[in-house]
Amino acid sequence: MMKNKPNVRYLALGALLILVWLTQWIPALATIYSQTIYPLISYVLSFFSGLFPFAIGDLFIFLSIAGVIIYPIYARLRKKLPWKKVLLRDGEYLLWIYVWFYLAWGLNYSQKNFYQRTEIPYTAYTPENFQEFVDDYITQLNRSYTPVNSINQDLIREETVRIYNQLSDSLGVHRPPHDHPRVKTMLFTPFISMVGVTGSMGPFFCEFTLNGDLLPANYPATYAHELAHLLGITSEAEANFYAYQVCTRSQAMGIRFSGYFSVLGHVLGNAKRLLSEEEYAKLFQRIRPEIIELAKNNQAYWAAKYSPVVGAVQDWIYDLYLKGNKIESGRQNYSEVVGLLISYQEWKKMN
């Protein structure tokens, strides 16, 4: 399978593993990777993956999982290889995958966070700043409402790329590597819908994918969120923040509404936790009935596709994955977008 001399191959693998670990441990190396090396990697890999009309990352992951499972059976039963040799080969393959993942994208987990990159100070929640944020948010959400019944992929791509280019310097995010990034539809959309995932970043080939079942109102913000991951953003909260900033700055009404609508669940979740029942009820009543109806329909739509058993397993695995990559809050990281929005709002008032 691998024709290099084993000792040379093992030396190369060992050297790359050490490089990955050093970059994770030394902040200066992580900065060099995220600011200088990764943009070049993403340019090359996203160009390559863009040559294919399907998600090659999804196919690669599927074939890798299948190979890791099937190879030991084949090697043991047909080739009569000893278990030790079989498992060592499987283990070596997984280590190469580990190295590829981190060198191609995963080392961005070790970069500076949003506050460090932008020098925008973190602002802690207070009853005053949270209430101010929520009042302004609901006002803008209601104003932005427009029925979204179709998906204009060209417009969404053009607007998202244009605004990311505008925000890049001020908000600490890379510019898109290409003017026409090619989004892919997830290969296994029915299964992905069963676990409630709407999009993903394919790290091995720097391609971002969207669930084929996405509804029109969700599509623009999800596109901007997953593109943020392609731009090196690993935090889910930060990706939500950038998607919000990009979409709400668009002149296209459907895209702008999608941006505001994308964080509604996170805002209400924080409000329910921080406000009294009476305050929360008043806040909820301020939201336009059409938006509440849309949110309920969205929830019912995804609930009908969701599998509690499969979804629970995926949630557990993804939570471990995030925590293992310096996202200490795990899946709760998504809702931390509200803290980023409040900090940004307070910073803008002083600048």
Residue ranges of model-derived segments:
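Pan-zinc metallopeptidase signature
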Residues: I291-N351
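Membrane-embedded alpha-helical segments of integral membrane proteins
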Residues: G14-Y74
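Active-site recognition of the HExxH zinc-binding catalytic motif
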Residues: P53, Y219-Q245
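Auxiliary, metal-adjacent structural segments of Zn-dependent hydrolase domains
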Residues: P147-F208, G212, P216
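Post-HExxH zinc-binding segment in Zn-dependent metallohydrolases
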Residues: F130-I138, T234-E277
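Alpha-helical transmembrane signal-anchor/signal-peptide segments
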Residues: A30-Q35, G106-N129
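Transmembrane alpha-helices and immediately adjacent membrane-cytoplasm interface residues
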Residues: I69-I73, K80-Q116
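N-terminal membrane topogenic signal
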Residues: M1-L11
